[in-house]
């Protein structure tokens, strides 16, 4: 019997990698629902190949999609729209596994819906967990959902931890002999750029990641090291550990995906070629394994591995994320909202690269932090933070 899969964000890089893995195992998995924000023609081609039962797009693309599916002889596919549609497919009784791969805050509600429906949730949308934090984790416990990390770093940590670590209560302290998590970072495309040159870098340069193929937003986050900051927050929630016990290590080759240190002096590392199909396959099949097209790591071609401390003077976003996690409450939500607006402004050439952390710091200082009680409060704070960020960006533009 095959497992039924819903892919939230099927046309993005994670969605595409998920399709590659699923296509190798039609005897184990079938695709029940897929969603996309744009790239409608690409979505139709996916429908032709995988024959999903349900598809979700924004309201403005419904007519176009319906016409294209009709022409393709796929008129029986159920078309839904908007956030309501996303939530509907994420919690659908027919779905066993949800790949949460929508980028940014837009993925929060459908991801939370999947968790509350007790699904096996493959978490690629780090922003959803950064925003909701304990609300998401408590929902997973209450509804017995299996929340498995897909980010290569968190998947590596998961593989390097004792097998029952995700079921532990959150004490903030390392448990089961763990002493510290080492979260690796490639350092991004500007790792060796002088500080004085960063103000002139372009979106095109920022989106050229040295090791990974990713979308624009996460590529810019990687360039500012905010991606590592968001991952630090995600790691604290997933693995029930205070930020004090998470060390970021710059590792330019992206061969070691993260490490866990133990009290006996051991350090366990997960290594592999930088290909997202590996963590996706691991999360899909855990505690089993799936074969993928990814070649095994050839250690003889990697003559050395480099490690260094992050330069937080050149990349202040990492410390902003750490401070937000330390502050707790809604601070990570505020950080994420400000970052999304700042990155979008940079991609639209409205602000310089070095202004991104400036926008984030301004918003953190001007939006009231509080304890996150419910998801409505999270969404309201997200909206306010975005408004403040927009205002500051417009002020800078003059």
From Swiss-Prot:
Residues that, per the record, bind Mn(2+): 151, 153, 231
EC number: 1.1.1.267
Biological role: Catalyzes the NADPH-dependent rearrangement and reduction of 1-deoxy-D-xylulose-5-phosphate (DXP) to 2-C-methyl-D-erythritol 4-phosphate (MEP).
GO biological process annotation, one example: isopentenyl diphosphate biosynthetic process, methylerythritol 4-phosphate pathway involved in terpenoid biosynthetic process
Catalytic activity as recorded in UniProt: 2-C-methyl-D-erythritol 4-phosphate + NADP(+) = 1-deoxy-D-xylulose 5-phosphate + NADPH + H(+)
Xref: InterPro entries: DXP_reductoisomerase, DXP_reductoisomerase_C, DXP_reductoisomerase_N, DXPR_C, DXPR_C_sf, NAD(P)-bd_dom_sf
Cofactor: Mg(2+); Mn(2+)
Coiled coil: none
Annotated NCBIfam families: Dxr, PRK05447.1-1, PRK12464.1
Keywords: Isoprene biosynthesis, Manganese, Metal-binding, NADP, Oxidoreductase
Annotated family: Belongs to the DXR family.
Pathway note: Isoprenoid biosynthesis; isopentenyl diphosphate biosynthesis via DXP pathway; isopentenyl diphosphate from 1-deoxy-D-xylulose 5-phosphate: step 1/6
Protein's recorded name: 1-deoxy-D-xylulose 5-phosphate reductoisomerase
Binding of NADPH, residues: 11-14, 125, 127, 215
Binding-site residues for 1-deoxy-D-xylulose 5-phosphate, renumbered to this chain: 126, 152-153, 186, 209, 222, 227-228, 231
């Amino acid at each position: 019997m095959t497992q039924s899969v819903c892919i939230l964000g099927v046309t993005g890089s994670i969605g595409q990698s998920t399709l590659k893995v699923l296509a190798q195992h039609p005897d184990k998995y079938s695709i029940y629902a897929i969603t996309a924000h744009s790239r409608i023609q690409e979505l139709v081609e996916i429908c032709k190949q995988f024959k999903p039962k349900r598809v979700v797009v924004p309201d403005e693309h419904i007519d176009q999609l319906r016409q294209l599916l009709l022409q393709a002889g796929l008129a029986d596919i159920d078309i839904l729209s908007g956030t309501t549609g996303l939530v509907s497919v994420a919690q659908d009784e027919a779905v066993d596994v949800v790949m949460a791969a929508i980028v940014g805050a837009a993925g929060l509600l459908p991801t939370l819906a999947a968790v509350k429906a007790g699904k096996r949730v493959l978490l690629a949308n780090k922003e959803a967990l950064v925003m909701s934090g304990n609300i998401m984790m408590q929902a997973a416990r209450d509804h017995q959902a299996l929340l498995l990390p897909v980010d290569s770093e968190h998947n590596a940590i998961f593989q390097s931890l004792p097998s029952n670590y995700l079921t532990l209560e959150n004490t903030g302290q390392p448990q089961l002999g763990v002493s510290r998590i080492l979260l690796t970072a490639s350092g991004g495309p500007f790792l060796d750029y002088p500080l004085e040159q960063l103000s002139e870098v372009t979106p095109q340069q920022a989106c050229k990641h040295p090791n990974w193929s990713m979308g624009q937003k996460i590529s810019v986050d990687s360039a500012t090291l905010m991606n590592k900051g968001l991952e630090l927050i995600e790691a604290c929630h997933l693995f029930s550990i205070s930020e004090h016990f998470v060390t970021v290590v710059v590792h330019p080759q992206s061969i070691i995906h993260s490490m866990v240190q133990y009290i006996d002096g051991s350090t366990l590392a997960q290594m592999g070629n930088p290909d997202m199909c590996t963590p996706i396959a691991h999360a899909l099949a855990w505690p089993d394994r799936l074969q993928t097209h990814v070649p095994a790591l050839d250690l003889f071609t990697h003559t050395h591995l480099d490690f260094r401390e992050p330069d937080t003077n050149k990349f202040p976003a990492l410390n902003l994320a750490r401070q937000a996690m330390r502050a707790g409450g809604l601070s990570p939500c505020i950080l994420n909202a400000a970052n999304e607006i700042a990155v979008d402004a940079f991609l639209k050439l409205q602000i310089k690269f070095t202004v991104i952390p400036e926008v984030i710091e301004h918003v953190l200082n001007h939006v009231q932090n509080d304890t996150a009680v419910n998801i409505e409060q999270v969404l309201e704070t997200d909206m306010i933070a975005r408004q403040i960020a927009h205002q500051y960006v417009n002020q800078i533009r003059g």
